[in-house]
């Protein structure tokens, strides 16, 4: 409001229309959509990087037989590379979801105080085509397709958009948690492990340990991310009529931390997938120990 007042002092004739029907949501909601699009693009780039590393690993170890597990019990042989494709496939599904969110993301545009565009109808003397032209112009200026503006809104864009986006991010968390959990189990079997730095020690009391701390951190952050989905879900369900302000504080925390958690997870994934360690002799030993039982039927 202080800015509007200051501009009005400098431009008295425009004081009555300089903020006509804009509301803080005109600035805030459109900005949020732009920022989330940029965030999704950054997530997409890192996700593709992780997939490239997993694809390389899968190709390298596609012919190395190992034991597959169902119910965490020895089942039938598979290969180390084939198992890696399970991890990669779920991340591809996440990439497709991110792409869908980017392709369908729309700006709020100019909708006025309650979504009726009444103030803009007044400004343009009832010329609806001019309002549509303003919406298209804003979308184009912000790097969106001129038609990528929500058709209807209240004071805010639908908070289902936030729920959709955070669900897509949580999907990445799910996939990364599955990968990290598998790797933690394989580290216990001593078949595979995450990279272990030159000067890294297991713990102050037990320096000989090889704790899978990166994968543990992935799981911890992923758990937070998956629970964070509840926030925009409840916000959407409790958005009274054209809007309530109790969405604001929650949204600012939930969406920002959801993106930050996803970014942190993918950073760790890039590190882990770049240096996966396989112990072929242990892999073969465990396979051979179980193989007689798998061919006995």
Predicted regions and their residues:
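A helix-coil-helix interface module used to build multimeric assemblies
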Residues: 1-118, 124-141, 202-203, 213-217, ...
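Conserved helix-loop functional segments at active or binding sites
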Residues: 60-63, 97-100, 104, 140, ...
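Short, charged/polar, low-complexity loop and linker segments
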Residues: 29, 72, 156, 242-243
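Amphipathic alpha-helix face/heptad-repeat signature
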Residues: 3, 39, 43-50, 80-87, ...
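Residue-level signal for pocket-adjacent positions within structured domains
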Residues: 13-15, 22-23, 75, 105, ...
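Acidic, glycine-rich loop-and-beta core segments that form the ion-binding/anion-interacting portion
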Residues: 126-229
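Structural signal for well-ordered, non-membrane alpha-helices
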Residues: 8, 48-51, 55, 92-95, ...
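Glycine-rich cofactor/substrate-binding loops
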Residues: 190-191, 203-297
């Amino acid at each position: 409001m202080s800015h509007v007042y200051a501009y009005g002092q400098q431009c008295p004739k425009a004081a009555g229309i300089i903020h006509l029907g804009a509301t803080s949501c005109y600035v805030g909601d459109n900005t949020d959509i732009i920022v989330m699009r940029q965030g999704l693009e950054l997530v997409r780039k890192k996700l593709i990087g992780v997939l490239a590393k997993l694809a390389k690993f899968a190709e390298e170890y596609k012919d190395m037989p190992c034991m597959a597990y169902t119910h965490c019990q020895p089942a039938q042989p598979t290969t180390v590379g084939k198992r890696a494709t399970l991890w990669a496939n779920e991340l591809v599904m996440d990439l497709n979801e991110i792409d869908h969110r980017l392709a369908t993301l729309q700006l709020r545009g100019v909708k006025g105080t309650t979504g009726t565009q009444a103030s803009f109808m007044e400004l343009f003397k009832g010329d609806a085509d001019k309002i549509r032209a303003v919406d298209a112009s804003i979308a184009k200026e912000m790097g969106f397709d001129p038609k990528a503006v929500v058709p209807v809104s209240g004071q805010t864009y639908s908070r289902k958009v936030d729920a959709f986006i955070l669900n897509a991010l949580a999907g990445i968390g799910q996939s990364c948690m599955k990968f990290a959990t598998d790797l933690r189990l394989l580290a216990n079997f001593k078949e595979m492990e995450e990279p272990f730095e030159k000067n890294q020690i297991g713990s102050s009391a037990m320096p000989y340990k090889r704790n899978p701390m990166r994968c543990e951190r992935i799981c911890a952050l992923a758990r937070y991310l998956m629970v964070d989905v509840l926030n925009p879900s409840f916000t959407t369900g409790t958005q009274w009529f054209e809007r309530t302000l109790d969405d604001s504080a929650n949204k600012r925390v939930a969406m920002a931390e959801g993106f930050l958690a996803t970014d942190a997870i993918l950073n760790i994934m890039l590190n882990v997938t770049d240096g996966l360690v396989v112990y072929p002799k242990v892999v073969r030993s465990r396979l051979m120990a179980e193989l007689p039982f798998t061919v006995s039927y």
